[in-house]
C-alpha cells in the first residue's frame, strides 16, 4: 500500500514534528519581516524600556496561555486513530500551516480590497473542487505572453457553461444557499413571463420534454404552470434572454443601463424575487424532497426560505439507508396531485449517521422521466458534505486512464502477462503486436507475387487476380506503416491521449485489412466496441481493485484470511453522476482534512450568481450583467472583436477579480480558511494518486472493522472457547463509505428494548460525556465511539425489517415505532489505522473489537444481574 499520505500529517505521535515546527517558525519569521519592511523608516513605538515596564502584562498573558493549553488538554484526542466517534480526525500539515499563515494576515475574504491574496486562493482552490466533483471550472485568464491560439481558446471557453464554487462556514450554510438559489431559479420565469407580456418582449423557452430539434415556445404562450416547471438550466439562461430582449426594446442604450432597466422591470413584478413570497407560494406551493437520513439543515433551510419544514417531504430509505427512488416518484406524483410544485430533490452523498450514498444516477433518470412525460423538472442538489472528497478516487491522471484502456485492448488481443506492466510496457506490447502483423502481411504479399511469377513462367493460369491481391496488400501495408510511425511518435513524446486517438483510427481504418490470422477476430471486436472509453463497469471494476486489501482476522489460534474491497457499480455510478446535478455541498473540514470552518457550495452553472447578486456601494466590483458574463477572475473590459480588428497586443489588459460579498449568503469570512484550503489542495492534489490515497486508507479501515464485526459472533466463540452473552449486529450490506453502524443484541432479551439497553450500556464504556458536565481527561479512555437513535419519523420500518428478522426480535414493528433503535456509530476517517496495521505489529481495529467484546460481555452480565434482582 502506498504510504505517501503519511508525509502530509503530523502523525499520531507527532513524528513529523520537526518539519512542522521548522515550517511554522519560518512562517512566523517571514510575517515579522513583512511587518518590519513596510515603511521601515517609521519610528518604533514599543521600546525595550516599555517592554520591561510591561512585564506584568506579559506575565499575565503567558500565564493565561499556559492555563488555556492546560484546559485544552481535556479535549478529545481527535487526531488519534483510537478516536472513531464523530466526524473529526487529524488534519493535514498543509491545512494547519496554511490556516496559521492566513490567520496572521487576518484578511476578510468578502472582497479583494480586504483580501487581495486569499480571495484569489479561494477561487483557485474551489476550481479544483469543481473539477473533483465533475463540474467544469471557469477558464483561467491566459498569461500576457500567451499565444494567439491560447486567447482564442479562452474566448471560446468564456462562451461555454462553467461552474462556480466558494467557501462557506460549513455544510449547513452551503445547503441553505443552494436551496436559496433553487427557489429563485424556480420562480424567476414567472416574473419574466409577466414582464414580457406587459412590455411586449419576444422571448422563447423550451419545455422540459422538448427534443433538441423541437422549436422553442414563445414565453407568453405558455401557462404559468408550464413556465414554473421548466428545467433549472433553461431558467438560468432565461436571464440572458430576458436582458437581450430588454436591450432590443431599448435601442442605443448602454449595456449597464440596460441591466438596470431589466432589474427595475423585474422588481416591479408581483412574481419578482424582491416581492413577498405569499403570492407565488399560494399559487404554486413548493415542496422539497429528501430522505429521512438527510441532514437536519434541509428543514432548517426550508424554514429560513419561507417554504416551511412541513413542506419537506420525507422519502423512504431502503435497507442500506439510501433514498428509495420508487417512493420518491410516488411522493412527487402525490405532490403534483395536490397542486404543489417540486422545487428540489436533495440527495445525500454520504449520510451523517450511516455514510449512505443516495442513488444520484437513478434520481437523474427519474427527473428525465418527469421532464419527458409530464413537462416537469426540479432542481437536484447533492448534500455531500461528508462524502464529497471520495470523488477524488475517480479523478484519474491521463496515464491512469490510458493504462486502463490499454489493459482492455491487450485482453482483446489475448496478450496477457502475469506480472504488472508499466504504461510504457503496455504500449510496446501493442506496437509489437501490430508490427508483427505487418511482417505477416509483407510475407503474404511476397507469397502472392511468387505465385504470380511461377504461374506466368508456367503459363498455366490467369494471374490477373493474384497481381491485384499483391498490389492491394502492398498499398495497404504502406499506409499502415505510416500510421504505425505516427503511433510510435505519440508514444515517444508521451502524448498518451493522442496515442489512443491514433490507435483507434488505425484499427477502424486498417484493422481488419492488415491484421492477420489469429488477431483478425479480436481486431473486429475492437473496431465495433467502445473499448476506447471508460464505461461505468470499467470504472467500478478498477476502483474496487484499487480500493482493496488482504486482511487477517486472528484471535488466539484461530485465523481467517479475507479480501476486502470497496465500491460496486451502483455506488460508483452515483458518484460519477455528480457532474450532472445542479449543485453540491462538500465540506473540506471533514474528509478534506482541513480546519473548521471550511465548507464549500458548488454550482454547475456560474450564471446563478446573477440571481442572488446584491449591491454594496462600499465594495468595488466589476460590471455584472447577463449579456457580458465573466467568471469571478477574468480579463477586465476585454473586447475580443475590437482586439482582432486592431491586432492590438493582449498584454494591455488587466486581470480583475470579483468580490464574493455580493454573491454569497454570508458576509465577512476568514481568509485563513481559504489559505488552508489552497495550501492543502496545492500540496495534496485532489486526484487518486494524492488525496485519493487518504480516502482509500479510510475506506479500507472501515471495511476491515465491518468484517470483524460481521464475523465476530461465530469466530469468537470458536477462538475463546466460550459462549457469548451478546451478538454484534450489523445491517447486512457493507457500508457505502467509512461510517460503520451496528448494534449489540442481548441474547437473553430478544426485544428492541433489550438491544437498546445493552447498546447504551456499552456506549458508556467508550465515551466521556462532556455534554453532561463530565470534565475528566481522556488519557485512560482506550477508544471513543458515538451513538445515534433511528426513529420511525425518519427511518421507515421497512428499512429495518430484514435486520429485525435476522435478529429474531418479537413484536419488532410495534416496539420500533414506540421506542426507536439505538445503534453505535464508528466514523473511520483517521488516516493512520490501516497504515499502523501494515507498518507495525499493532492492529487497532482488532484491539477495538476486543475492548468492545469485554464491554459487551460485562454489560450483558450486569443487565442479567439487574433483571434477576
Regions found by a protein language model. Give the residues of each.
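N-terminal entrance/gating region of PLP-dependent enzymes' catalytic architecture
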Residues: 1-163, 173, 186-194, 217-232, ...
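PLP-dependent aspartate aminotransferase-fold enzymes
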Residues: 1-6, 88-99, 105, 109-344, ...
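Secondary-structure transition/capping motifs at alpha-helix termini
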Residues: 135, 185-192, 305-310, 334-340, ...
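Short secondary-structure boundary/capping segments
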Residues: 181-185, 303-309, 359-364, 394-407, ...
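Active-site C-terminal subdomain of aminotransferase-like
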Residues: 355, 406-440, 466-515, 520-738, ...
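Glycine-centered flexible beta-alpha turn that most often forms the glycine-rich phosphate-binding loop
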Residues: 383
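PLP-dependent enzyme catalytic core of the Aspartate aminotransferase-like
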Residues: 464-467, 471, 483, 487-488, ...
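Conserved PLP-binding catalytic core of the aspartate aminotransferase-like
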Residues: 721-807
Amino acid at each position: 500500500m502506498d504510504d505517501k499520505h503519511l508525509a502530509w500529517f503530523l502523525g499520531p505521535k507527532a513524528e513529523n514534528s520537526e518539519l512542522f515546527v521548522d515550517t511554522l517558525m519560518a512562517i512566523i519569521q517571514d510575517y515579522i519581516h513583512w511587518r518590519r519592511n513596510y515603511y521601515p523608516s517609521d519610528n518604533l513605538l514599543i521600546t525595550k524600556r516599555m517592554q520591561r515596564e510591561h512585564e506584568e502584562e506579559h506575565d499575565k498573558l503567558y500565564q493565561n496561555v499556559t492555563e488555556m493549553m492546560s484546559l485544552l488538554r481535556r479535549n478529545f484526542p481527535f487526531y488519534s486513530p483510537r478516536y472513531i466517534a464523530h466526524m473529526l480526525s487529524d488534519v493535514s500539515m498543509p491545512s494547519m500551516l496554511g490556516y496559521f499563515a492566513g490567520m496572521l494576515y487576518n484578511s476578510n475574504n468578502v472582497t479583494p480590497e480586504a483580501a487581495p491574496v486569499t480571495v484569489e486562493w479561494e477561487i483557485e482552490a474551489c476550481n479544483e473542487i469543481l473539477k473533483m466533483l465533475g463540474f467544469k471550472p471557469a477558464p483561467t485568464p491566459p498569461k500576457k505572453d500567451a499565444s494567439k491560439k491560447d486567447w482564442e481558446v479562452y474566448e471560446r471557453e468564456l462562451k461555454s457553461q462553467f461552474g462556480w464554487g466558494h467557501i462557506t462556514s460549513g455544510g449547513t450554510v452551503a445547503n441553505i444557499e443552494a436551496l436559496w438559489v433553487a427557489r429563485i431559479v424556480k420562480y424567476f420565469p414567472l416574473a419574466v413571463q409577466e414582464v414580457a407580456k406587459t412590455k411586449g418582449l419576444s422571448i422563447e423557452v423550451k419545455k422540459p420534454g422538448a427534443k433538441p430539434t423541437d422549436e422553442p415556445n414563445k414565453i407568453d404562450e405558455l401557462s404559468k404552470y408550464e413556465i414554473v416547471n421548466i428545467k433549472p438550466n433553461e431558467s438560468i439562461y432565461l436571464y440572458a434572454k430576458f436582458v437581450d430582449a430588454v436591450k432590443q426594446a431599448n435601442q442605443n442604450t448602454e449595456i449597464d443601463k440596460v441591466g438596470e432597466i431589466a432589474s427595475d422591470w423585474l422588481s416591479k413584478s408581483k412574481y419578482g424575487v424582491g416581492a413577498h413570497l405569499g403570492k407565488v407560494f399560494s399559487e404554486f406551493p413548493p415542496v422539497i424532497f429528501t430522505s429521512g437520513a438527510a441532514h437536519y439543515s434541509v428543514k432548517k433551510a426550508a424554514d429560513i426560505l419561507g417554504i416551511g419544514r412541513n413542506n419537506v417531504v420525507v422519502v423512504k430509505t431502503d435497507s442500506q439507508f439510501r433514498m428509495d427512488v420508487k417512493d420518491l416518484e410516488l411522493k412527487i406524483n402525490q405532490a403534483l396531485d395536490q397542486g404543489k410544485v417540486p422545487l428540489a430533490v436533495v440527495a445525500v452523498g454520504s449520510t451523517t449517521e450511516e455514510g449512505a450514498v443516495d442513488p444520484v444516477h437513478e434520481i437523474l433518470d427519474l427527473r428525465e422521466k418527469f421532464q419527458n412525460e409530464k413537462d416537469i423538472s426540479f432542481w437536484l442538489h447533492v448534500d455531500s458534505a461528508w462524502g464529497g472528497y471520495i470523488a477524488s478516487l475517480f479523478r484519474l491522471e491521463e496515464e491512469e486512464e490510458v493504462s486502463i484502456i490499454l489493459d482492455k485492448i491487450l485482453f482483446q488481443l489475448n496478450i496477457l502477462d502475469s506480472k504488472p506492466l508499466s504504461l510504457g510496457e503496455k504500449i510496446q506490447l501493442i506496437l509489437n503486436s501490430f508490427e508483427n502483423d505487418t511482417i505477416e502481411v509483407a510475407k503474404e504479399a511476397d507469397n502472392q507475387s511468387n505465385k504470380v511469377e511461377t504461374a506466368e513462367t508456367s503459363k498455366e493460369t490467369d494471374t490477373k487476380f493474384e497481381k491485384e491481391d499483391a498490389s492491394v496488400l502492398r498499398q495497404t501495408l504502406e499506409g499502415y506503416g505510416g500510421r504505425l510511425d505516427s503511433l510510435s511518435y505519440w508514444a515517444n513524446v508521451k502524448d498518451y491521449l493522442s496515442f489512443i486517438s491514433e490507435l483507434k483510427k488505425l484499427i477502424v481504418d486498417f484493422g481488419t485489412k492488415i491484421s492477420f490470422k489469429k488477431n483478425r477476430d479480436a481486431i473486429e471486436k475492437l473496431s465495433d466496441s467502445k473499448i476506447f472509453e471508460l464505461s461505468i463497469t470499467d470504472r467500478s471494476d478498477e476502483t474496487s481493485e484499487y480500493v482493496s486489501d488482504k486482511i487477517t482476522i486472528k484471535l488466539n489460534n484461530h485465523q481467517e484470511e479475507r479480501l476486502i474491497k470497496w465500491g460496486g457499480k451502483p455506488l460508483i455510478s452515483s458518484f460519477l453522476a455528480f457532474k450532472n446535478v445542479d449543485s453540491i455541498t462538500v465540506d473540506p473540514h471533514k474528509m478534506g482534512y482541513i480546519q473548521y470552518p471550511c465548507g464549500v457550495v458548488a454550482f454547475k452553472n456560474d450564471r446563478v450568481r446573477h440571481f442572488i447578486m446584491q449591491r454594496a456601494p462600499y465594495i468595488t466590483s466589476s460590471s455584472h450583467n447577463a449579456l457580458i458574463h465573466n467568471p469571478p477572475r477574468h480579463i477586465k473590459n476585454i473586447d475580443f472583436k475590437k482586439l482582432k480588428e486592431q491586432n492590438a497586443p493582449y498584454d494591455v489588459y488587466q486581470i480583475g477579480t470579483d468580490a464574493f460579498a455580493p454573491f454569497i449568503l454570508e458576509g465577512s469570512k476568514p481568509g485563513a480558511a481559504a489559505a488552508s484550503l489552497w495550501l492543502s489542495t496545492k500540496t495534496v492534489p485532489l486526484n487518486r494518486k494524492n488525496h485519493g490515497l487518504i480516502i482509500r486508507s479510510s475506506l479500507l479501515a472501515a471495511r476491515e472493522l465491518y468484517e470483524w464485526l460481521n464475523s465476530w459472533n461465530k469466530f469468537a466463540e470458536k477462538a475463546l472457547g466460550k459462549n457469548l452473552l451478546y451478538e454484534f449486529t450489523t445491517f447486512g450490506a457493507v457500508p457505502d463509505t467509512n461510517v460503520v453502524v451496528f448494534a449489540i443484541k442481548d441474547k437473553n432479551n430478544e426485544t428492541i428494548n433489550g438491544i437498546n439497553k445493552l447498546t447504551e450500556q456499552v456506549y458508556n464504556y467508550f465515551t466521556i460525556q462532556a455534554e453532561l458536565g463530565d470534565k475528566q481527561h481522556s488519557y485512560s479512555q482506550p477508544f471513543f465511539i458515538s451513538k445515534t437513535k433511528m426513529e420511525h419519523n425518519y427511518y421507515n420500518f421497512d428499512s429495518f425489517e430484514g435486520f429485525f428478522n435476522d435478529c429474531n426480535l418479537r413484536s419488532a414493528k410495534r416496539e420500533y415505532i414506540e421506542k426507536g433503535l439505538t445503534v453505535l456509530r464508528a466514523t473511520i476517517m483517521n488516516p493512520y489505522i490501516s497504515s499502523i496495521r501494515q507498518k507495525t505489529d499493532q492492529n487497532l481495529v482488532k484491539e477495538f473489537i476486543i475492548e468492545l467484546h469485554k464491554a459487551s460481555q460485562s454489560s450483558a452480565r450486569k443487565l442479567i444481574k439487574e433483571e434477576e434482582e
